[in-house]
Amino acid sequence: MSIQDIVETYSTKWYVVVLVALIVYKVFDFFYARYLMYKLGAKPFLQSQTDGYLGFRVPFELMGKKSEGTLIDFTYQRTLELDNPDIPTFTFPIFSVLIISTLEPDNIKAILATQFNDFSLGTRHSHFAPLLGDGIFTLDGAGWKHSRSMLRPQFAREQVSHVKLLEPHMQVFFKHIRKHHGQTFDIQELFFRLTVDSATEFLFGESVESLRDESIGMLNDALDFDGKAGFADAFNYSQNYLASRALMQQMYWILNGKKFKECNAKVHKFADYYVEKALELTPDQLEKQDGYVFLYELVKQTRDRQVLRDQLLNILVAGRDTTAGLLSFVFFELARTPRVANKLREEIEDKFGLGQDARVEEISFESLKSCEYLKAVLNECLRLYPSVPQNFRVATRNTTLPRGGGKDGLSPVLVRKGQTVMYSVYAAHRNKQIYGEDALEFRPERWFEPETKKLGWAFLPFNGGPRICLGQQFALTEASYVTVRLLQEFSHLTMDPNTEYSPKKMSHLTMSLFDGANIQMY
């Protein structure tokens, strides 16, 4: 058969052309990657994982684990199943695209700080924009810098130190606990209501008062506008949906259902109500407002409705969810660890008194910071249960990470432009090389040991680098105040000894307990 006959025979076989083109592309890409490694001083990855299906099974497997409450521990377990778990940087495919996963502190430091400009949020804006728009958590570059400069003054010490604003909400919270008369109840559900009440008061100038309901003989007349109904449920649904979109990476657009759009609209209507109220105020009226209101301060900087709504919703996610999740894990662990609860109660008694002798007026931003064991308890919960357990960045250029390559795994590895790097704070915080053989145990005393004074990038409860959480002091102050007040007010804290441990975790944009924190408190 002549060459002309071969060409005529196969010229109409389009799939042959596609196959040849694919082979040529793969060969070229292989050698180009080798060239980049040589140019940047990188070595091949020591370890990789595959599902045998070019990564098409992975995202659906992850979403299945998410719906079961086992996603976080499943991804952590994958790092333990590496041929060499001591070199915790590897690749795995999602939809045939290689993803890099790491929990190596030097690599995380590079991503978040020393090579900050080499990485961006990638597709996060597309994942989250339907709910959160253009806010500090969804933007990169100049937009992010502008958002941060706008929001930073709102988290100055004088704003985060106003703990007395929490006390009216705590009094309602106590009523909910007492109505159970020592029986088991889910305190996590109450924490989410408490933090949305306090967050909306801080952000909007008035609380949604979600804790006030008929079960404790209190009517909620705070929400008297159209758009109030179902706000919390809509917010929860949309956040859960966003987490699923993030797991799909570049295929996020598959998840864009009708209910998701309806819930986003409800949340936006809720925020728009407060934005319009604030915009109706004149500059003189804004200056004369009593107390501090986050929204009013933003209105002094911009009158753009979209900007105001987006920034408020971004901060509401952080202000409500991170603190509620942290408090839930704190009381879950205190209830199952009486030794720690008793030791913490002793410190609180010494500092502020208990029960009828409680000196609530002495609880302040400054006095809370002097509670060393309380600080250790919070740190230990943030170590075992970081609010954002997993995150990712996307390379903006061809670059490297310091560890994971070569025969010993200690050489730099190549990160291609557009490649996703996932990092697990949850797994890094459980690294036995760093935290010892008891790394999986809840032991606050470790925070008084010399080793924990020099953790650096091995402890990242609030992220790190230029994008470190602006509201970390706000969250810690609120969590500290609530913990102190609850232990002052109630002397008994227990849990069913048959409660599953380690608990299942809910993974939305932040982490919480999948089955709630079911305790007895009286």
Swiss-Prot record:
Subcellular location: Membrane
Enzyme Commission number(s): 1.14.14.-
Cofactor: heme
Induction comment: By various alkanes.
Signal peptide (residue range): none
Domain of life: Eukaryota
Record has Transmembrane as a keyword: yes
GO cellular component, one term: membrane
Functional summary from the UniProt entry: Together with an NADPH cytochrome P450 the enzyme system catalyzes the terminal hydroxylation as the first step in the assimilation of alkanes and fatty acids. Preferentially hydroxylates hexadecane.
Protein name: Cytochrome P450 52A2
